[in-house]
Design a protein with these regions (language model features):
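Active-site and adjacent substrate-binding regions of carbohydrate-active enzymes
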Residues: 1-294
Length: 294
């Protein structure tokens, strides 16, 4: 039998970064694009490329007897060598911009990750996005309060001072819509949405705008789990059921945190399917928005 490691979907096998020939092929591809004139890269899931070897079993941290795969990424040695090598062989000689999707970084290490001669030009600030999360699953997560959100913003501004700048986000393709996640229900209106947008635009750093934010997009009201395509959402739905939530409660939890909230077809106008397609879209169109009538 043959096996391969995948930290995400089974159709997304992890590459073996321990192989220097593989790393050189990656750098070759990056430089090909940089030579074409692109300005830089958004580097996804980069903290996942280094795993402690040899592979071993880890203690269960959930009721199903399994453990969160992220547990193997805690204190692996050698990650910085890979990141520095990539920087030296690709973005640095091209004077290119790079922004890293970096989770779990200790504040004392920020100077190694952002700056003129760091691994990346900037990294995304996920401090407020992960606030309230636990390893148990979405059913155990807590939505950050306005005061907690403010504290996250203040902390990030302080730790980056004199070092470099973060790339600030409210949402992206892996997050629920920010207006539904961060704003209290009474503030989920036009004024509240504009205030949230203005606030992160006024922070020091580089604001990344995700499609739909210009409309003040909110979460989609998914009628059933069948309307959700995201594999992690479906997994979390089953986990909710296993810990005792009923189907209605499980759907409520998953509908709030699902990545599909940010992946519904974009509404270009007020025609069928928002003008996104004349066919059948892979996800339902959020019924709250019809751009032609906004």
């Amino acid at each position: 039998d043959w096996y391969y490691l995948h930290m995400f979907h089974k159709k997304q096998p992890d590459l073996n970064w321990e192989n220097p020939k593989l790393r050189e092929e990656i750098y070759k591809m990056m430089n090909w694009w940089l030579d074409k004139g692109i300005a830089g890269f958004r580097v996804d899931a980069i903290m996942n490329i280094k795993k402690p070897l040899p592979f071993q079993d880890y203690p269960a941290d959930r009721e199903d007897g399994l453990c969160n795969v992220g547990g193997i990424l805690g204190s692996q040695e050698g990650l910085r060598d890979f990141l520095n090598e990539m920087h030296e062989k690709t973005t640095k000689p091209h004077h290119a911009f790079s922004v890293g999707e970096v989770f779990g970084l200790d504040d004392s290490d920020i100077s190694r990750f952002i700056g003129d001669d760091a691994y990346f030009t900037s990294i995304f600030d996920f401090r407020q996005n992960v606030a309230g999360q636990t390893m148990l699953g979405w059913y155990d997560w807590k939505v950050p309060t306005p005061d907690e959100y403010k504290e996250c913003c203040f902390t990030s501004q302080k730790v980056s001072e004199g070092v470099g700048f973060f790339s600030n986000i409210i949402e992206n393709h892996d997050e629920p819509r920010g207006v539904s996640h961060y704003l209290p229900e009474y503030a989920q209106n036009e004024k509240g949405k504009k205030l949230l947008g203005m606030m992160y635009f006024m922070l020091k750093g580089l604001p990344f705008i995700y499609q739909g934010q210009e409309l003040g997009m909110a979460n989609c009201a998914f009628p059933s789990i069948e309307a959700i395509d995201d594999v992690s959402s479906r997994d979390e739905y089953q986990r909710c059921l296993k810990v005792g939530l009923n189907e209605k409660e499980a759907l409520k939890v998953v509908s709030h945190y699902s990545r599909d909230n940010g992946r519904t077809p974009f509404q270009w106008n007020d025609e069928k399917n928002g003008g996104f397609t004349t066919g059948t879209p892979w996800l339902m169109v959020n019924p709250q928005y019809k751009v032609g009538g906004q």
